[in-house]
Amino acid sequence: LKQETMDFITVCETYFFRELEQLKDVIFYIKSLDRPVNVLCAPCSSGEEVYSLAILASENFVKGMNIVGIDINKKMIDKCNEMIYSERSVSRLNTMQKTRYFDVKDRMYHLKKETLACRCRFDLCNVFDDSLFKFGKFDVIFSRNMMIYFDQDFKIRLMERFYRILNKEGRIYPGKSDLVPETAYFEKNFSAGGVYYSKVD
């Protein structure tokens, strides 16, 4: 498909601190590893989930965390790099968080990159393209509401690809609406923030 078509058909609805308990679960797991950690956010949409993790990492004194966000929608990647968000997008942040992490100009919230404790980068990528493997290995894959668009065969293919890029003891955190297939690659687990899948080695 042409890039213009991809940009039109992909759904990009999100906001900061969406499903906060799951975000906290991710951060607590990363902190427990007590070492540098690589996180993949696929799809990253307009960046709110990546930057939500980055804000929580800063507030919980997590160091050595790197986040890669990928999406097939170029407009969303551009928006991630612009770091400018609406009042609605930041409505779940408290006043102190808005003040600390954003500058407000013309009722738009400009994220202050220097306030984030971790490195965030974004790239145009289709999860079924081999360019996925250029990013190396990850400890956490954060993948919300992507599988809802795939049939069973594509879901299994996706889980196989995620397995290949996850480190030992790596985890996948899906969205609440995702129907994740059972495979030999992952074990389903439950936590306060919902469901996650741990890599079977």
What are these regions (language model features)?
Residues 1-37:
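Conserved AdoMet
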Residues 36-47, 68:
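Conserved class I S-adenosyl-L-methionine
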Residues 34, 62, 85, 167:
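Short conserved AdoMet
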Residues 65-142, 146-150, 154, 179-180:
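Extended basic-aromatic, gly/pro-enriched interface segments that bind polyanionic ligands
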Residues 140, 182-201:
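Core SAM-dependent methyltransferase catalytic element
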Residues 156-168:
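A short glycine-rich, Lys/Arg-flanked "PGG" loop and its adjoining helix->strand segment in the class I
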Residues 168-176:
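Conserved beta-strand signature within the Rossmann-like core of class I S-adenosyl-L-methionine
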Residues 46-61:
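Conserved SAM-binding loop of SAM-dependent methyltransferases across substrates and taxa
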